[in-house]
């Protein structure tokens, strides 16, 4: 079992570096970053990867609220200086702060997410850029170094709660003087600078019948609020009493720079596996779809990164006809092409299979593709994500392809695929 410098276990490292003698651990669920088609462009390494599997710890690692008090010099208070004491400091003024101490909770496991590569962070998340991310660089990240923490009940794994902010290497969380905070009765709470937003789907994520819910903000203490006027506004939203911070299968978590999808262990049992998706590719290729111009057989590749191959399929985004690479009907000025099957003029893009199973809401043939990126998936999966608004900028929203984070185009954001072998 791999231990960190702060004494906690790393589930990712334990999973990859186990000696094979440990019993399989209970899987709580997965956190999957939107915008990656199964892995990071540079490859998944350690805690930096496209998805993070939450396993039950050998020993409980959770903490719960214990007591709070006011101090005059927060930086020199005992709780802050004690590296073994989890605490949150709410700065009220230069000379006054409320310290909330936390104690061990034997009923929960804690997992932390953020941009920092320090040991308390279980899942290192960097800013997601749309499209091809091979050479992309972010000049200034908007993701917090210690963005959020998730506490899972060890006896009731379906109860996974999310909280804004995570504990640093000294087991402290600091909310500065300018941070949004408030005190109700005896409890104090606050929001992080750019906030942690959550969106629970309405209905079951598996099955494809769920609808997009409303985005909410989660506080440091775990309460749920309506969104602020802008991402970092000082005034908090209204409390939402009929919603909670328990993650549901399909809950989205936005960290202002990256959006994560929570898939519960139960939900994943009803989702396709990578092997299932590869079999779907084989089934399409077995039909030997042809290009109507070159008359060559098209082959959907399994690999995500593909070059201009003679058998590579392309889709006309205005009509959905799938063909090979050719120069017929190309407009030299705009680059648009006229489809030889229906004479519709429009853009053409390479067709690529969506290979991240967690994004699928059902199991079936990949008969639709996102516009404009060309990632293929099932009809219900494509239509679900085309109706999900992802936070963008300070107060905007936009629908994106979950496999590459490219903003969707067109009236619907998707197109039904028409293969030559299915034509009469």
UniProtKB/Swiss-Prot annotation:
Pfam families per UniProt: Pellino_FHA, Pellino_RING
InterPro entries listed in its UniProt record: Pellino_fam, Pellino_FHA, Pellino_RING
Domain of life: Eukaryota
Keyword list, A-Z: Phosphoprotein
GO molecular function term, any single one: kinase regulator activity
Gene Ontology biological process terms in this record: innate immune response; negative regulation of antifungal innate immune response; negative regulation of defense response to bacterium; negative regulation of Toll signaling pathway; positive regulation of antimicrobial peptide production; positive regulation of Toll signaling pathway; protein K48-linked ubiquitination; protein polyubiquitination
GO cellular component: cytoplasmic side of plasma membrane; cytosol
Region described as Disordered: 1-21
The UniProt record lists the keyword Phosphoprotein: yes
Phosphoserine: residues carrying this PTM: 10
Signal peptide: none
Protein role: Scaffold protein involved in the Toll signaling pathway via its interaction with pelle/pll kinase.
Subunit structure: Interacts with pll.
Family named by the database record: Belongs to the pellino family.
UniProt name for this protein: Protein pellino
Record organism: Drosophila melanogaster
Gene from which this protein is expressed: Pli
């Amino acid at each position: 079992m791999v231990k960190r410098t702060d004494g906690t276990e790393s589930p990712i490292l334990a999973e990859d570096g186990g000696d094979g003698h440990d019993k399989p651990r209970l899987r709580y669920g997965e956190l999957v970053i939107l915008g990656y088609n199964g892995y990071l462009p540079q490859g998944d390494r350690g805690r930096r990867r496209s998805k993070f599997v939450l396993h039950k710890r050998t020993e409980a690692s959770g903490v719960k609220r214990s007591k709070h008090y006011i101090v005059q010099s927060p930086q020199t208070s005992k709780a802050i200086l004690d590296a073994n004491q989890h605490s949150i400091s709410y700065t009220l003024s230069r000379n006054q702060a409320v310290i909330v101490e936390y104690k061990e909770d034997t009923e929960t496991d804690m997992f932390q997410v953020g941009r920092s590569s320090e040991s308390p962070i279980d899942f290192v998340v960097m800013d997601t850029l749309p499209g091809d991310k091979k050479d992309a660089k972010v000049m200034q990240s908007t993701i917090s170094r210690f963005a959020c923490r998730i506490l899972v009940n060890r006896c009731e794994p379906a109860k996974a709660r999310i909280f804004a902010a995570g504990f640093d290497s000294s087991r402290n969380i600091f909310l500065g003087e300018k941070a949004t905070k408030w005190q109700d009765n005896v409890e104090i709470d606050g929001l992080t600078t750019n906030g942690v937003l959550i969106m629970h789907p309405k209905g079951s994520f598996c099955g494809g019948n769920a609808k997009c819910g409303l985005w909410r903000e989660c506080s440091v203490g775990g309460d749920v609020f309506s969104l602020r006027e802008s991402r970092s506004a000082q005034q908090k939203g209204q409390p939402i009493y009929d919603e909670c911070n328990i993650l549901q299968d399909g809950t989205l978590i936005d960290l202002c720079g990256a959006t994560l999808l929570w898939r519960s262990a139960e939900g994943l049992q009803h989702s396709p596996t990578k092997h299932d998706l590869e079999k779907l590719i084989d089934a399409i290729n077995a039909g030997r779809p042809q290009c109507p111009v070159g008359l060559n057989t098209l082959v959907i590749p399994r690999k995500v990164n593909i070059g201009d191959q003679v058998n590579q399929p392309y889709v006309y985004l205005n009509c959905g006809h799938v063909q090979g690479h050719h120069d017929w009907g190309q407009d030299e000025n705009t680059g648009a092409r006229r489809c030889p099957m229906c004479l519709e003029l429009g853009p053409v893009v390479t067709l690529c299979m969506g290979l991240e199973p967690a994004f699928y809401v059902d199991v079936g043939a990949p008969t639709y593709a996102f516009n404009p990126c060309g990632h293929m998936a099932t009809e219900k999966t494509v239509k679900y994500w085309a109706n999900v608004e992802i936070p963008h900028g300070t107060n905007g929203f936009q629908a994106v392809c979950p496999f590459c984070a490219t903003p969707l185009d067109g009236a619907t954001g998707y197109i039904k695929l028409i293969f030559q072998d299915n034509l009469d």
